[in-house]
């Protein structure tokens, strides 16, 4: 190997040995091979020849000369181009000075490093002590903060419990007023029905007697009582809303304090050896606080004072409601007793059409049952077809990942595609049939509703002819009902659980109001029967009624 640009004194630049051997003939030129693949390397990749020096170099092959060739050595005629002189660059003095400088620099660096190490140890001890003291102080502050939060939280919880108790009392009172006003719909509708029935009297019986006068006074008194109770219930509802606002404010404050207490307790329990600690850069520069300790305590104190004012208002409303209950119940019972002293009733009936409608309703119900079973079977069939469709589609999806020429459109591929189309067509057919069955079921349900409505109308007509005024007025709501302690259920007849009102009227129809009336049909609570079953509103009769919900009023002539 011969390097270019070296000094004459280098051992590898000696005179070239002349060898007596003949030079070998030049080898044939190697064929040029071009790589079709160029490798891609990520940034920072070091190639295999990265170790080679950057100076020019040349590799030569040389045969070793025998011993007799050494006598013919001669100095080279051309010196290397980088050689500037034939003498050394430095003197002994320069060499000594350089060594001395290196030793003194190393000593100075060592002394400086020793002083720096000592100072660093002292700084670490001082900062460790300072940080430990600051951490202890912060922990004490966090503990005090947790105690303050716990105190205000307990005060808020105590006030919240009292407010919840008062709100429950107000809710109960509101329900009592609503139930009492709703309960008065029954005797009110009875009185109105009696007036309507008496208007159907013929001839000399159309007399404005004491019964009619008492009925009018009873209707006016019942409406007046309802208005007073509803107005008071509306005031109580507004107060409940105010209580709920105060409750929400307390709950939000308690929730915030619970979260803050949990966070501060977690921060207080954090130690240097905790697993949940981490770096959060820049948090010391972010100030998201919105209050100071004084405003923080004042906020909770204002919530407590506001809650106390709401409770005082609620207590005054409850006292007013109790006085109203006591006064109105006495007046209603006195007027009801005076009205019942002068009443008589007439009875008639009509059942033929109702029985036919009931028979048709039974057939419709059976057909609805069959349609529901068919829908269930169709839905099961659709669900059962989904799994084979998933299998076929999954197989197709998996076969799309075959490599290269293996993506063959073979018989399996054709069969899978055909299977998917067949199953999908089957599903569409079943879904179409399911929709048709559901439409048929909807039509049956609508027919059933119409039949039930017709049954209610026929039952109402039957009641007009069968049950008259005295059957409706055999009882009156008790004092607990008038004061709202008990309330008849939705869909039940008036005066439910009152033995005199539950009477039979010569038929086999079972009414949702708890009475049987002359027919053979079940009227689901919507038919008027014997004056004791509820009416859903004015749709069952030719006279308007003011019932607010099913089960709360009578049909006009029921």
UniProtKB/Swiss-Prot annotation:
Keywords attached to this entry: Cell projection, Cilium, Coiled coil, Cytoplasm, Cytoskeleton, Flagellum, Ubl conjugation
Processing and modification events after translation: Ubiquitinated, leading to its degradation. Deubiquitinated by USP16, promoting its stability.
Main location: cytoplasm
One family name in Pfam for this protein: Tektin
GO cellular component entries: axonemal A tubule inner sheath; microtubule cytoskeleton; sperm flagellum
Top-level division of the source organism's lineage: Eukaryota
Tissues where the protein occurs: Specifically expressed in testis.
Keyword Coiled coil found: yes
Subunit structure: Microtubule inner protein component of sperm flagellar doublet microtubules. Interacts with TEKT3.
Summary of the function given for this chain in its UniProt record: Sperm-specific microtubule inner protein (MIP) part of the dynein-decorated doublet microtubules (DMTs) in flagellar axoneme. Forms an extensive interaction network in different conformations that reinforces the helix bundle composed by other tektin proteins (TEKT1 to TEKT4) and MIPs to anchor the tektin bundle onto the tubulin wall of A-tubule of the sperm flagellum.
Similarity remark: Belongs to the tektin family.
PANTHER family: TEKTIN (PTHR19960), TEKTIN-5 (PTHR19960:SF23)
Entry protein name: Tektin-5
């Amino acid at each position: 190997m011969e390097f270019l640009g070296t000094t004459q004194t280098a051992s590898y630049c000696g005179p070239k040995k002349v060898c007596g051997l003949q030079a070998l003939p030049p080898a044939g030129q190697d064929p040029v091979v071009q790589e079709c693949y160029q490798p891609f390397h990520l940034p920072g990749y070091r190639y295999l020849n990265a170790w080679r020096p950057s100076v020019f170099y040349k590799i030569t092959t040389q045969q070793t000369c025998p011993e007799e060739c050494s006598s013919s050595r001669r100095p080279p005629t051309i010196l290397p181009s980088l050689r500037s002189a034939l003498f050394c660059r430095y003197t002994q003095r320069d060499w000594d000075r350089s060594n001395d400088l290196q030793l003194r620099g190393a000593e100075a660096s060592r002394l400086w490093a020793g002083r720096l190490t000592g100072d660093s140890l002292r700084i670490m001890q001082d900062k460790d002590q300072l940080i430990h003291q600051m951490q202890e102080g912060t922990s004490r502050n966090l503990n005090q903060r947790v105690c303050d939060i716990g105190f205000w939280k307990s005060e808020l919880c105590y006030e919240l419990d009292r407010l919840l108790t008062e709100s429950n009392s107000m809710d109960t009172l509101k329900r009592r007023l609503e139930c009492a006003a709703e309960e008065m719909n029954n005797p009110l509708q009875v009185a109105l029905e009696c007036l309507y029935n008496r208007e159907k009297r013929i001839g000399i019986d159309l007399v404005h007697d004491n019964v009619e006068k008492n009925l009018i006074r009873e209707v006016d008194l019942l409406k007046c009582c309802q208005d007073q109770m509803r107005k008071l219930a509306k005031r109580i509802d507004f107060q409940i809303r105010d209580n709920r606002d105060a409750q929400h404010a307390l709950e939000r404050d308690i929730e915030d304090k619970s979260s803050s207490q949990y966070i501060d307790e977690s921060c207080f329990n954090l130690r240097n050896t905790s697993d949940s600690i981490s770096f959060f850069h820049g948090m010391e520069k972010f100030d998201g606080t919105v209050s100071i300790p004084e405003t923080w305590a004042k906020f909770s104190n204002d919530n407590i004072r506001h809650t106390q004012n709401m409770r005082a208002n609620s207590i005054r409303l409850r006292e007013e409601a109790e006085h109203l209950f006591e006064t109105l119940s006495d007046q209603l019972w006195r007027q009801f007793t005076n009205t019942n002293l002068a009443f008589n009733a007439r009875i008639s009936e009509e059942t033929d059409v109702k029985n036919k409608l009931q028979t048709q309703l039974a057939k419709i119900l059976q057909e609805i049952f069959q349609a529901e079973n068919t829908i269930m079977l169709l839905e099961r069939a659709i669900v059962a077809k989904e799994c084979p469709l998933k299998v076929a589609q999954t197989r197709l999806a998996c076969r799309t990942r075959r490599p290269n020429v293996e993506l063959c459109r073979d018989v399996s591929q054709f069969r899978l595609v055909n299977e998917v189309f067949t199953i999908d067509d089957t599903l569409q057919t079943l879904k179409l049939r399911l929709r048709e069955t559901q439409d048929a079921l909807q039509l049956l349900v609508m027919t059933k509703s119409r039949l039930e409505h017709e049954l209610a109308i026929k039952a109402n007509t039957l009641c007009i002819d069968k049950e008259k005024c005295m059957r409706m007025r055999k009882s009156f709501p008790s004092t607990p009902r008038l004061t709202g302690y008990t309330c008849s259920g939705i869909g039940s007849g008036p005066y439910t659980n009152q033995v005199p009102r539950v009477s039979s009227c010569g038929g086999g129809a079972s009414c949702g109001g708890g009475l049987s009336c002359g027919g053979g049909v079940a009227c689901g609570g919507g038919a008027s029967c014997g004056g004791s079953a509820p009416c859903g509103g004015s749709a069952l009769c030719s006279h308007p009624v003011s019932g607010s919900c099913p089960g709360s009023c009578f049909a006009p002539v029921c």
